[in-house]
UniProtKB/Swiss-Prot annotation:
Part of the ABC transporter complex LolCDE involved in the translocation of mature outer membrane-directed lipoproteins, from the inner membrane to the periplasmic chaperone, LolA. Responsible for the formation of the LolA-lipoprotein complex in an ATP-dependent manner. The gene is lolD. Its EC number is 7.6.2.-. Keywords: ATP-binding, Cell inner membrane, Cell membrane, Membrane, Nucleotide-binding, Translocase, Transport. GO terms for cellular component: plasma membrane. PANTHER family: IMPORT ATP-BINDING PROTEIN, LIPOPROTEIN-RELEASING SYSTEM ATP-BINDING PROTEIN LOLD. Belongs to the ABC transporter superfamily. Lipoprotein translocase (TC 3.A.1.125) family. ATP binds at residues 41-48. GO terms for biological process: lipoprotein localization to outer membrane; protein localization to outer membrane. The complex is composed of two ATP-binding proteins (LolD) and two transmembrane proteins (LolC and LolE). It is an enzyme of class 7 (translocase). The keyword DNA damage does not apply. The lineage of its organism: Bacteria, Pseudomonadati, Pseudomonadota, Alphaproteobacteria, Hyphomicrobiales. Residues 5-225 form the ABC transporter domain. This is Lipoprotein-releasing system ATP-binding protein LolD.
Length: 226
């Protein structure tokens, strides 16, 4: 299988009271094209840090992130922002939708920032909302949506620009079990239907078992799970 995202010898160190705090130590990982991979690890293990590095939101202390065969280690902040905007979609535990805009507008705006015409952005946004069965809420603001509806809108926003990689940090962690299962099924179906590659952090091993592979963080390295 062809690699879409590679983490190579990733190290991430912080300093706490003048002492180094090592979060990741020579961590390696390959996400293949079309794969759905679960990142299963307890709170505080470094899941969010790993996702932020993979998504070019945070620079590693050492190592390289290779996206679609392109090294990102020495890219400028502007270059990293452009790569992230075009190639990476994010979904978080809390939706982070813009409260003053409707569900539809929340999906249109990132596309227009990326350079899409409004008519094209609106058409794609409506198709995504329809696919995720939340089109009837298109003109409602986030505060008027249920938790599950908010997350489905957030998923639509994350994939609207046509990224090659989707990164999700506990996307169902704030939902009840029934809604969580529904949102996960919607997310995984969209990933498979669109040919995306996805790395999804979750505490839910039942959901993780439905993905192609499972990884965890052990002794500050990335380890495959059965």
């Amino acid at each position: 299988m062809a690699a879409i995202l590679e983490l190579v010898e990733i190290e991430r160190h912080f300093f706490e009271s003048h002492k180094p705090l090592i979060i990741l130590d020579k961590a390696n990982f390959i996400l293949n094209r079309g794969e759905l991979v679960a990142l299963v690890a307890p709170s505080g293990a470094g899941k969010s840090t790993l996702l932020h590095i993979a998504g070019l939101l945070e620079k590693p202390t050492a190592g390289d992130v290779i996206l679609r065969g392109v090294s990102c280690a020495k890219r400028s902040d502007n270059e990293r922002t452009a790569i992230r905007r075009n190639d990476i979609g994010f979904v978080y535990q809390f939706h982070h939708l813009l409260p003053e805009f409707t569900a539809l507008e929340n999906i249109i705006i990132p596309q227009m920032i990326a350079g899409f015409k409004k008519s094209i952005a609106e058409d794609r946004a409506l198709k995504l909302l329809t696919y995720l069965r939340v089109s009837h809420r298109a003109n409602h603001r986030p505060s008027e949506l249920s938790g599950g509806e908010q997350q489905r809108v957030a998923i639509a926003r994350a994939v609207a620009n046509g990224p090659s990689v989707l990164l999700a940090d506990e996307p169902t962690g704030n939902l009840d079990p029934v809604t969580s299962a529904y949102v996960f099924q919607a997310l995984s179906a969209l990933v498979r239907q669109s040919g995306l590659s996805a790395l999804i952090a979750t505490h839910n091993y039942g959901l993780a078992k439905q993905m192609h592979r499972r990884i965890t963080l052990k002794e500050k390295k990335i380890v495959e799970l059965p």
